[in-house]
Amino acid sequence: MKLSMKLKLITTDYQNQVLLDTMQRFNSACDYISDIAYNNKVFGQVNLHHLTYYDIRDKFGLGAQMTVRAIGKVVESYKIEKKYKHTFKPFGAIVYDSRILKFKFPDKISISMLEGRQVIPFIFKNYRDIDIRRASGQADLVYHDGIFYLVVCVDLPEPPQDDTKEFLGVDMGIVN
């Protein structure tokens, strides 16, 4: 069973500013990629990658994997609707994967930004008995009301199924 968990990042003023700059630059790159995709009617990951990768690296100064994630974000948005050019909010979410985000258990992450990697502490409300070490796959960096959150997917084991040996049948009558 998979659950989403929201981790609150405890950033310094410097980290906060660099994350904001990273978000703006990432989403500006997405707008640029979207413009090329729409004008050339190229919406597939591989073809769009060949058209834009080196351009994005040079113009926006994003790292290799951040550039790939930006292209992926645009490709995903065009899977839904291809008739209109898509735009991205300056502080829209960034999708991180295991190459640009690492957990430093029990309470820190190492996250890639424009200025390199930073180690940032996090906190979360443990409503259930969830082991954060089970976080897997991608995570979304979200900015809301001046606070950064990381939304991660946690893979939980399936609860055991009860083996029922007896049962009771109830006659509900005949329905015509």
Identify the residue ranges that each predicted region occupies.
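Nucleic-acid substrate recognition interfaces
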Residues: 1-176
